[in-house]
Amino acid sequence: FLTNDKADHVDEIIDLVQMYGDKVIIHHSGIDIDFVKQKKIDYILSDRYSHIIKRDVIDYLNGNAINTHPSLLPFQRGYQPNFFSILLNTKKGVSIHKIDEGLDTGDIIVQEELFYNDQDTLKTSHYIFRKAIVSLLCKNWYKILNENILPIPQERKGNINYKKDFDIFFAQLSNGWCTTVEEVKNILKNKPLIRVEPKKFPAKKSHS
């Protein structure tokens, strides 16, 4: 189980995996092929992990590596996707997808659209999407493990957000994470939009 040392609400996901009789190794730092072989890892579940998983690791696991992501991919890839879903007024939601070499570009396994009201805050919206991710995993974990869900390739559109963009906008919020959804949406009203240009993604190469 790959995550970061500041991530909250990870116990529910760990408990879910252990409920199916699997041993869970919790890891925060980077991994390589030697680590995977030494620990005899056969599946990776990534949740808010901050390191790149290299191609040789993905190939060694035969694609058995998935990630949770708090947006309706292909929109809001990258940093703080929930925040940018609100700011840029795109659909909100959560996705579970295969891990590939790209940034949140892997095939989509399952998704769920979410809805916030204007008086929700960034903090309460975080609580909502975390519960949704856990629920989505609970409903589909057995089917994911047994490959009973056919992953769907992502459309080659969408956008990527970066920490430097988030820092610019978040600095304008006097209430920080207690800022309401309505206030976040209003940041761009009557102000020039600092555009987050869609990144063009090349066609996926076959690794046969």
Regions found by a protein language model. Give the residues of each.
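One-carbon transfer enzymes
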Residues: 1-208
